[in-house]
Amino acid sequence: MPKPADHRNHAAVSTSVLSALFLGAGAALLSACSSPQHASTVPGTTPSIWTGSPAPSGLSGHDEESPGAQSLTSTLTAPDGTKVATAKFEFANGYATVTIATTGVGKLTPGFHGLHIHQVGKCEPNSVAPTGGAPGNFLSAGGHYHVPGHTGTPASGDLASLQVRGDGSAMLVTTTDAFTMDDLLSGAKTAIIIHAGADNFANIPPERYVQVNGTPGPDETTLTTGDAGKRVACGVIGSG
């Protein structure tokens, strides 16, 4: 007598066939809906991919130092020799980028501090100015630096003020085209000095203020110093 057909086996085969058909149809539909895109590193093509290579120049999100840049450094110390800050001067594209950073906390009082380049590369505590007079800390560095042929206010060596945080630390990045690297290294060289107080940049409106002798506007001391007070840290530029 013949065996009855195994309906369960037929059902399993039918299910497998149908599943394969549906999967094949789904793949065909997905293929039809997708554009034949291929990975490309050519700008403007899609889809974009990460290749593991560095970003092209100009696309990294920040400026890089120019290949021809030249630099000078300085370490600023207090009258007792304690290291207070470092300074770096980078020269490129016709101007200098000046970076000042404190080396620790608590060495400067919070607030604004005058910051200038001075005309002589000497940072001697309790010294006399080149023009003579009573001694004082770092007076050997002379007055604010002027490039040859420049006079008046602001001086060539006047920089943006350093703002010190509550913990006594600070950092400043500023730019200037008032001098070149050769200017800072010529002759007696130059020094960078942090002062005890803020610099008013001789901003004394003559229509509002008069001197004790009745002359309107800033006096000679204000014009030459900015009334920034004592010299609290000094470094010879180019000394490292």
From Swiss-Prot:
Keywords of this protein's UniProt record, alphabetized? Antioxidant, Cell membrane, Copper, Disulfide bond, Lipoprotein, Membrane, Metal-binding, Oxidoreductase, Palmitate, Signal, Zinc
Summarize the activity regulation. Answer: Inhibited by the copper chelator diethyl dithiocarbamate.
Question: What is this enzyme's EC?
Answer: 1.15.1.1
What are the annotated disulfide bridges? C123-C234
Q: How does it sit in the membrane?
A: Lipid-anchor
Give additional notes from the record: Does not bind zinc ions. Has normal enzyme activity in the absence of zinc ions.
Q: What is this protein called?
A: Superoxide dismutase [Cu-Zn]
Q: Which gene name belongs to this protein? A: sodC
